Amino acid sequence: MVPFVLASASPARRQLLQQIGIDPIIQPSHFDESVIQAATPTELVRLLARCKAETVAQSYSAPALILGCDSVLVLGGEIYGKPASPEMAIARWQQMRGQTADLLTGHALIDLAQGRTCVEVESTQVVFAQVSDAEIAAYVASGEPLACAGCFALDGQGGAFVEKIVGTPSNVIGLSLPLLRRLLLSLGYTLADVQNKK
């Protein structure tokens, strides 16, 4: 089995990997995202995912696969990362309700053994419910939206406020499992190569 490192502290990403039999080594990158400037949201998540994976890869010398990810929600051309405050989360939800947005997740997979990197971006459309101000206030008070790109967690309380997903649901949670499989294949691996054997 090839060691698989997740360059993220995200519990949701870790759970997604565990669902498909991968128990990753968790090593958050602590990369300063503010240093990255990009012309488009797609370029931004691509660069951030790569920088996170490369930062963690520097601390490994043995063969391993390093996965870095970054997600943003795009609504009306505006990028919604994690909100800086409850007030910002409320304002964003007031803009998001009843709207359709795109959730973009950049994925960078580094194979240290081959010295190769694959970087791809997955986009999933999210249709939000027409939620009331009271529902928004209660949801933000739960604290959940403050830890999530786009101010919601599909796999948490926020799932009740999503009417429809067009695309890959796991991408909205933070990691496209079908895309991860394709990235592994492009580097010459299968899921079985990184799954923990019982």
UniProtKB/Swiss-Prot annotation:
One of its GO terms (biological process) is nucleotide metabolic process. It catalyses: a ribonucleoside 5'-triphosphate + H2O = a ribonucleoside 5'-phosphate + diphosphate + H(+); a 2'-deoxyribonucleoside 5'-triphosphate + H2O = a 2'-deoxyribonucleoside 5'-phosphate + diphosphate + H(+). The active site is at D70. It is found in: Cytoplasm. Its EC number is 3.6.1.9. Its cofactor is a divalent metal cation. NCBIfam families: maf (TIGR00172). Nucleoside triphosphate pyrophosphatase. May have a dual role in cell division arrest and in preventing the incorporation of modified nucleotides into cellular nucleic acids. PANTHER family: BIFUNCTIONAL DTTP/UTP PYROPHOSPHATASE/METHYLTRANSFERASE PROTEIN-RELATED, BIFUNCTIONAL DTTP_UTP PYROPHOSPHATASE_METHYLTRANSFERASE PROTEIN-RELATED. Belongs to the Maf family. This is Nucleoside triphosphate pyrophosphatase. It comes from Thermosynechococcus vestitus (strain NIES-2133 / IAM M-273 / BP-1). The lineage of its organism: Bacteria, Bacillati, Cyanobacteriota, Cyanophyceae, Acaryochloridales.
